């Protein structure tokens, strides 16, 4: 697996992400400095981008949004997100631009 996805001690996936808010659409834009680069249409105001990120990841990984957790980076472009162990990280790259 890529450097941006690793297993946590509890068996969950930990994703290291770089987020660009205010993009034209929600899309995985490849890798950037060891992180998965995701562009989001939502603005980085009033927690809109974080909410959009979790919704986008849930759809891409086919898991419930409530099973994702923002671990670090609440106000940063660099984020750590935990996903359940049965999530398939490679699904995030299937539609990368």
Features from the language model and the residues they span:
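Contiguous, often N-terminal, cationic amphipathic patches that form binding interfaces
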Residues: 1-54, 63-65, 69-74, 79-97
């Amino acid at each position: 697996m890529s450097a941006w996805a690793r297993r946590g001690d509890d068996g969950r996936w930990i994703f290291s992400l770089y987020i660009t808010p205010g993009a034209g659409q929600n899309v995985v834009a490849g890798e950037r400095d060891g992180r998965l680069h995701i562009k989001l249409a939502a603005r980085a105001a009033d927690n809109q981008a974080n909410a959009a990120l979790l919704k986008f990841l849930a759809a891409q990984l086919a898991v419930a949004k409530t099973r994702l957790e923002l671990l670090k980076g609440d106000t940063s472009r660099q984020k750590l997100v935990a996903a359940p162990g049965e999530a398939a990280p490679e699904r995030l790259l299937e539609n990368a631009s």
